[in-house]
Amino acid sequence: MKNTEINIRDPFVLVEDGTYYMYGTRAATCWGAADGFDCYVSKDMEDWDGPFEVFHKPEDFWADRNCWAPEVHKYRGFYYMFATFKDSSVHGGTAILKSESPLGPFVMYSDRQITPRDWECIDGTFYVSPDGTPYMVFVHEWVQISDGSICAVELSRDLKEAVSEPVTLFHASEAVGWVQTITNKNRPGLHYVTDGPYLYRTGGGRLIMLWSSFGKEGYTEALAYSDNGDITGKWTQDDRLLFLKDGGHGMIFESISGELYLTLHTPNEHLKEHPVFYRLIEEEDTLRVAELS
């Protein structure tokens, strides 16, 4: 199938042994009870096989609602899935699952979510600092705090648990050059959304974070920069958006031929979402989309 036939949100691509493995949130069950995650497989980013189910909730699973934003990272010889689960009675968050294969089956590895159990959290991603320290970088959601934030927590070296208190890196409202508020009938007032953090280091050593929110033209892909090249730095927001209209929750990967690509979902409309791929250019210690220049 073509990527236009694949109905997922939050695409994430792992490149392994000349093969692209693409994971994502099932759009059909995105906003309700869901039971797992799939993978699509390709050799060229054009024709895809699948979906192949890589995780299915067991009967006694701890979260009965949404399954969101699966990311698969290879670390010390195993494949770790960072995925968000929501429940109707307790706070949701990002857990870590483990497999010996990118095609699963993935099984629960952490004890429920890594993120704080009294926070509403989503979209955990994986980051390893230059000194080898692993972190989960995640969203503390606007649904609980109104001004959504991006936070980080240090992980144990085996990725089994958090070993530090969470630290707030920045709030969505700090992106004063472009961010727009939203309203919601279930929560009075104006709110700022944070979604989908992803870390990328330039050839010059600059640490960039991709993240999503809403701008004047809808869902967006934004850029933030650390001033010390690590997660512990002071983060500043770029007024220039990487992708500005009706698409987001992206990540970066290197193609089999060595080119840099951005994938994200667009449009940001239920049952119409699909993954797209744009070649990226790294210049002046930042990123831009080649096809949009």
For each feature predicted by the language model, list its residue ranges.
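Carbohydrate-active catalytic/glycan-binding domains of CAZyme proteins
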Residues: 1-293
